[in-house]
Amino acid sequence: MVKVEFAGDVKNLTSYIEKDAKAKIDSVVEEAVKEAEKLLNEKKEELLERAVVDVEKLLSDAQARLSAEKSSIDMEVRRKVEERKKELFQKVVEEAWKRALEEAEKKTERYKKFLEKVLIAMSNEAGEDEVIAYVRADDLEDVRAMVQEKGLKNVVEVKDVKEVGREIKGGVLGKSKSGGVWYNYTLEKAFDELLREVYPKVLEALGF
């Protein structure tokens, strides 16, 4: 009969249990670690994905802002260019008008040719209508001579424009003798028409 050594058996059993328990614990820990790593990797991917999305969103937002700012800057530049155009054009206009007034004031040959030209144009427009030509006091003598010289028979009178309560810088303001029609051939009207005609050319000359 074999004598059972309980002490040894217990010791061996205890050792086995400890090993088995340790193995199970290690297994559980290993599984837990793997699960944790898996979760961590998933979260890491999620975080990375979110980070990429966030970066792309930031870049997209930044691009949108830059685009908006560029559009705003472009609009501001265009606005300033337009303002500059107007300023330069206004200076050209003012200088041209100043010269026109000087020509009229000095009654230069160029102004006299202009006066003759508009007087004939007014007479032609009036046709069979008899008209009274109203001019500046300084131009009365010259215009009366032109009417005779050019044989403008429908221009029946030449008077000072102030008689009808008007003031002009030059040229001729005609009125039908019946009083129903006015013919505007003043220096002011001619200058306005000239501006509309040469405006594009002036802008081109200014580099726009």
From Swiss-Prot:
DNA repair in keyword set: no
User: Where in this chain does the entry annotate a coiled-coil region?
Assistant: none
CC terms in the record's Gene Ontology section: plasma membrane; proton-transporting two-sector ATPase complex, catalytic domain
Among the record's GO biological process terms, what is one?
Answer: proton motive force-driven plasma membrane ATP synthesis
* Cystine residue pairs: none
Q: Name one GO molecular function term.
A: ATP binding
The annotated topology with respect to the bilayer is:
Peripheral membrane protein
Q: Which UniProt keywords apply?
A: ATP synthesis, Cell membrane, Hydrogen ion transport, Ion transport, Membrane, Transport
Which InterPro entries does the record cross-reference, listed alphabetically?
A: ATPase_E_C, ATPase_V1_Esu
**In which compartments does the protein localize?**
Cell membrane
Among Pfam families, the record links this protein to:
vATP-synt_E (PF01991)
Q: Provide the family line.
A: Belongs to the V-ATPase E subunit family.
Subunit architecture: Has multiple subunits with at least A(3), B(3), C, D, E, F, H, I and proteolipid K(x).
> What does it do?
Component of the A-type ATP synthase that produces ATP from ADP in the presence of a proton gradient across the membrane.
Q: What is the name of the protein in this document?
A: A-type ATP synthase subunit E
Instruction: State the encoding gene.
Output: atpE
